[in-house]
A protein has these predicted regions:
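Charge-rich, low-complexity N-terminal segments
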Residues: 1-98
Length: 98
């Protein structure tokens, strides 16, 4: 999956999650992406910035963390860790204004 398609497909989900969290304007998003998606962290962040234009994510800072299969990471929103499989698409952090 390329960066453009991944960002475009994730935007509606990110908007729903922002709404569930009561955020009217998102200022920062950190995503954990498995390496099996074959994307570059820099290119994916730039693509998210492009698809965020004219949305409540406009000008949000985007950070992409690429993880390898069998990597131990802290599970977002939980105290425990998880072993990655390389296909992750996880929201690690979302900040903004209510």
């Amino acid at each position: 999956m390329n960066e453009q398609r991944l960002a475009a497909e994730m935007l509606p989900e990110l908007e729903v999650i922002a709404g569930m969290r009561g955020l009217t304007w998102v200022t920062r998003v950190t995503l954990i992406v498995g390496s099996m998606h074959g994307v570059s962290a820099t290119s994916l962040a730039e693509e998210f910035e492009r698809v965020f234009a004219d949305t409540n994510f406009d000008d949000a800072r985007v950070e992409i963390v690429i993880v390898q299969p069998q990597e131990e990471i802290k599970a977002p929103g939980r105290a425990d860790t998880m072993t990655t499989n390389g296909w992750e698409l996880l929201i690690s952090k979302m900040e903004g204004r209510k």
